[in-house]
């Protein structure tokens, strides 16, 4: 028989998880637990290795589509949907930690709140956090997806949600898929335009945070706000 039961005792992921805890397992072993079984030709650990190699580790795997997963020999629709559901649960659990009126007192607070959700995105996402008078997050909105451009990021879309939510202030964020959070000329121009509009209508743009891979840049700290 194939699957975890066929692997030598010291490499049985489910048994190791029960005895030593999930934290003791490698990425390939955790993936094997989710997959449960291998195929006729290979063990579940070999299948795990193949999947991780195909996606160059967890970074790309977390955003894998159903089509990409089932294209791998040994991964059917059932296994693919199990993985996709597990990854989505993981993302939601990360968000739960910072929900319920998370307070932002510094650029670091803001980056911590959004880092894990945004740093792996493969396209630029422009997101606004809407805050109350106590600097607590009352709403989060993705304004658009795509390359940041002053002609695309219209202040109307940013501030419309602020009025709907009776927000006192806004923090803007977007990610750089390259992992380098250094601001571009367009990033700075968009920021200045939004800040000026905020001054006119009385809703302050507190900061614009650029998210990289475990790095971030605050345009306020850089003197652009």
Swiss-Prot record:
Pfam families the record matches: RadC, UPF0758_N
KW Kinase (keyword) present: no
Binding of Zn(2+), residues: 174, 176, 187
Motif JAMM motif location, chain numbering: 174-187
CDD domains assigned to the protein according to its UniProt record, in alphabetical order: MPN_DUF2466 (cd08071)
Family per record: Belongs to the UPF0758 family.
Protein name according to UniProt: UPF0758 protein BA_4685/GBAA_4685/BAS4351
């Amino acid at each position: 028989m194939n699957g975890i039961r066929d692997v030598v005792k010291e490499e049985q992921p489910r048994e190791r998880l029960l005895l030593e805890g999930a934290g003791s397992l490698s990425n390939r072993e955790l993936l094997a637990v989710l997959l449960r079984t291998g195929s006729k030709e290979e063990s579940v650990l070999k299948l795990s290795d193949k999947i991780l190699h195909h996606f160059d580790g967890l970074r790309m795997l977390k955003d894998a589509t159903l089509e990409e997963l089932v294209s791998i020999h040994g991964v059917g629709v059932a296994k693919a949907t199990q993985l996709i559901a597990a990854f989505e649960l993981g993302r939601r659990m990360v968000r739960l930690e910072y929900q319920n009126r998370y307070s932002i007192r510094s650029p670091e607070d803001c980056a911590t709140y959004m880092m894990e959700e945004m740093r792996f995105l493969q396209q630029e996402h422009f997101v606004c956090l809407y805050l109350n008078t106590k600097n607590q997050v009352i709403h989060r909105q993705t304004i658009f997806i795509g390359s940041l451009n002053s002609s695309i990021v219209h202040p109307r879309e940013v501030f419309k949600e602020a009025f709907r939510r009776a927000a006192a202030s806004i923090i803007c964020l977007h990610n750089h898929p390259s992992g380098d959070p250094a601001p571009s000329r367009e990033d700075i121009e968009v920021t200045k335009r939004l800040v000026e509009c905020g001054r006119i209508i009385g809703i302050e743009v507190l900061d614009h945070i650029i998210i990289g891979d475990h790095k971030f840049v605050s345009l306020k700290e850089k003197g652009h706000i």
